């Protein structure tokens, strides 16, 4: 293990002894400076996203929302010590309630296979633990560019970690095989595909390049699709697992219809814990017109006033 990976690992273990409110205090101290640094990448991206999602919001309200989102970004970083820095079963004790478990139980009992769409919302690593504690699950993932981190991820997730399936041809075939046997797979639904490999569909009112893999798998296998996330409770009280049925049309043969339903499912999750979404992500960077500047580029160059939805 590389020295910097080992250092990160032992920092997580050391911070893991702290209660969640203390970790969030540290997270707030990390998130607030992102707001103070006007040209920080995280602030710029979050500000652009708020302009897209809330185009009619006045500047003061938008600034307050950006600040809140950046503080939650800090919380997302430090809460990893409570998840990866502890025994997995101890971390699961942070789950205080579950909403929508009846959908999950019914999907397992149906034997049709289950696709869990888990957006980058709240604490998705704790959601992985919760799912893995109830049923074997394989998650589709792209390995980190620096392979040294991959060993730490496997170690951190421990004995409750899901099976990790690479996002390549062999990995996708493994997902089909698992679903055909009535198994469970997890997919991050809002990862932006490469140009030409996705479908532009509305996301919070503006077309975004959307993955077609999940709708295609759902259409071809007949598996149930559910959305799920682990919401942070106020004042570090723990987490609430929320499970929602997928919108109608997510397995439609028409990809635009299916991807619109996929994005609507993500929206329904985000609307329940808005500031806990990963708003630092450049979700709308790729535009349908390749000659159109993406809004993040305009913002970085002081030209966000030219942006028109």
Regions found by a protein language model. Give the residues of each.
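Active-site metal-coordination segments of metallo-dependent hydrolases
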Residues: 42-45, 143-147, 207-211
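Short glycine-/small-residue-rich flexible loop motifs, especially phosphate/cofactor-binding loops
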Residues: 12, 47-48, 128-129, 154, ...
């Amino acid at each position: 293990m590389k020295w910097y990976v080992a250092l990160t690992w032992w920092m997580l273990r050391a911070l893991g002894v702290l209660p969640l409110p203390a970790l969030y205090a540290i997270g707030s101290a990390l998130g607030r400076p992102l707001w103070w640094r006007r040209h920080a990448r995280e602030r710029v991206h979050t500000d652009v996203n708020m302009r897209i999602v809330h185009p009619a919001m006045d500047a003061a309200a938008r600034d307050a929302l950006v600040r809140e989102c950046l503080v939650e970004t800090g919380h997302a970083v430090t809460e990893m010590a409570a998840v990866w820095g502890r025994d997995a079963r101890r971390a699961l004790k942070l789950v205080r309630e579950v909403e929508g478990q009846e959908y999950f139980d019914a999907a397992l009992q149906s034997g049709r296979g289950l696709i869990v769409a888990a957006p980058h919302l709240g604490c998705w690593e704790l959601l992985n633990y919760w799912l893995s504690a109830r049923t074997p699950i394989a998650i589709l993932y792209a390995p980190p560019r620096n392979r040294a981190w991959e060993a730490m991820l496997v170690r951190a997730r421990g004995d409750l970690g899901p099976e990790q399936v690479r996002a390549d041809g062999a990995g996708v075939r493994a997902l089909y095989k698992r679903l055909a046997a009535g198994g469970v797979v997890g997919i991050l639904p809002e990862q932006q595909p490469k140009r030409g490999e996705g479908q532009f569909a509305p996301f919070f009112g503006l077309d975004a390049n959307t993955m077609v893999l999940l709708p295609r798998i759902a259409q071809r296998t007949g598996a149930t699709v559910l959305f799920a996330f682990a919401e942070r409770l106020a004042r570090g009280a723990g987490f609430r697992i929320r499970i929602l049925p997928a919108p109608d049309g997510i397995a439609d043969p028409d990809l635009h219809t299916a991807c619109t339903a996929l994005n609507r499912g993500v929206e329904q999750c985000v609307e329940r814990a808005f500031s806990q979404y990963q708003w630092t992500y450049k979700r709308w960077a790729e535009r349908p017109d390749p000659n159109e500047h993406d809004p993040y580029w305009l913002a970085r160059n002081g030209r966000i006033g030219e942006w028109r939805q």
